[in-house]
Amino acid sequence: MEKIVNADGSDAICPASAACAKSIRSYQESYSLGEEIANAVTHGIGVGLSIVALVLLVVRAVHYTPADLTARYVVGFSVFGSSLIVLYLCSTLYHALPRGAKYVFGVIDHCCIYVLIAGTYTASCLTTLYGAIGWTVFGVIWGLACSGSVIYSVFGHRVRWLSLVMYIAMGWLVVFVAKPLRERLPEISFLFLVLGGVLYTVGCVFYALKRIKWTHTIWHMFVIGGSVMHFFSLYLSF
């Protein structure tokens, strides 16, 4: 391939390459080494907790649900647990990897938030929100998750605020099915469901304040808290 040079003989930079590099630089968030270690450690712990959660939920479904419902619960709980593992693993890798490797895992990390939201809904759709209403919610939430992931994959950090709004909006779409959930879930399970949503939402405030030191680590802790609440909501749902 012929080398492109400027009129003065210096190497020219391909406009497309320059735009790509600029996008990558704008995406990479300026965390200190201490912050990145804390970010990686917190969600590394989340990976371990997620594996435990997946095992406990599946074991409970196998041993304590009626035979005709077992498959539905196992699949729903498996999707939820797997989405937790994927989210926390990708987040840990993103914060642990060297700066030059962050871009791809950063995009995957943010897309995994959509996966976790949809995975959480899936567990409820297959267990508590069965029937037409369950499949409607399932289709809507996965459609939004796929759309959000594609948008973020194409535009990256430039649509960070749009993604944040979508995360919150998708999470609180649950208000449209709050009545059947309230009627079908034990009170303690419904309480944990709501508490999980509140923790995720409060955590989004710290996510938005990324220019303030340590706020991203605080966001991570709120995410873990929300995940724990939703684990207990599902575990105590029957």
Curated annotation (Swiss-Prot):
It is a multi-pass membrane protein. Its main location: membrane. The chain crosses the membrane at residues 39-59, 74-94, 103-123, 131-151, 161-181, 188-208, 218-238. GO terms for cellular component: plasma membrane. InterPro entries: AdipoR/HlyIII-related, Hy-lIII. It holds the Pfam family HlyIII. GO terms for molecular function: pore-forming activity. The keyword RNA-binding does not apply. The keyword Cell membrane applies. Keywords: Cell inner membrane, Cell membrane, Membrane, Transmembrane, Transmembrane helix. Coiled coil: none annotated. It is found in: Cell inner membrane. Belongs to the UPF0073 (Hly-III) family. This is UPF0073 membrane protein TP_1037. It comes from Treponema pallidum (strain Nichols).
